A protein has these predicted regions:
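Short hotspots in intrinsically disordered terminal tails
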Residues: 1-2, 188
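N-terminal signal peptide c-region/cleavage motif recognized by signal peptidases
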Residues: 21-23
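Low-complexity, acidic/polar, glycine-enriched regions of mature
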Residues: 26-191
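Cleavable N-terminal signal peptides
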Residues: 14-15, 26
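Bacterial N-terminal signal peptides that target proteins for export
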Residues: 2-13
Length: 191
């Protein structure tokens, strides 16, 4: 009887260890952006120079397993008031009523609907982008690669080109271009 009790206890410990190993695997699929990451956009001003903007407050998450990228998803919420600009003199105009209208629409959001695996760490991430209360489909050309020095980190480069007028922003305002290049550069860290 003593032998059976020991066997049962060993089996219980093994089952517990296997369960915790499984939980660890689930957490390995949840990712958050590191503080070093940049989420922002570029837009031409007066047809000549490029204005760069960065969201300094971004909430994000990603569920991703490189063995099953078709099941991946990501979601971003970007605070419009947190934007900083390479040309600060344009901030009020870009955040004003004719463009972002940040006083009324505090956040911009992106929610993925599909990850298309193109091979070699390249993906098209399809989803819904909401700016100024207007939602449109957008595809981000994305590269996700394991970080060479940290197995819990993936390097990311991602971009999408949109027409700002598709999101209710007025055309021809103050020499600000129609095309906006949205970019994400940085790292995802396993949560």
């Amino acid at each position: 009887m003593d032998f059976n009790l020991k066997t049962i206890m060993k089996s219980g410990f093994m089952i517990t260890a296997i369960a915790f190993a499984g939980i660890g695997q689930v957490f390995a699929e949840s990712w958050i952006l590191t503080p070093k990451s940049d989420v922002g956009f570029e837009i031409k001003s007066m047809g000549l120079s490029v204005v760069k903007a960065k969201f300094n407050q971004v909430q994000s998450m990603m569920q991703f397993d490189s063995k099953a990228p078709q099941n991946a998803s990501t979601h971003f919420v970007m605070d419009g008031d947190s934007l900083s600009f390479s040309k600060p003199s344009l901030k009020n105009m870009i955040l004003g009523e004719d463009l972002f209208y940040a006083a009324k629409y505090k956040t911009a959001t992106f929610k993925s609907t599909q990850f298309k695996d193109l091979g070699n760490g390249k993906y098209n991430i399809l989803g819904q982008l909401t700016l100024r209360g207007v939602t449109n489909p957008v595809t981000f050309a994305t590269t996700l690669k394991p970080n060479a020095s940290n197995a819990n980190v993936m390097d990311i480069q991602s971009s999408a080109m949109i027409n700002r007028s598709d999101f209710g922003m007025r055309k021809g305002i103050g020499g600000v271009g129609e095309k906006v290049n949205i970019q994400l550069t940085g790292q995802w860290k396993a949560k």
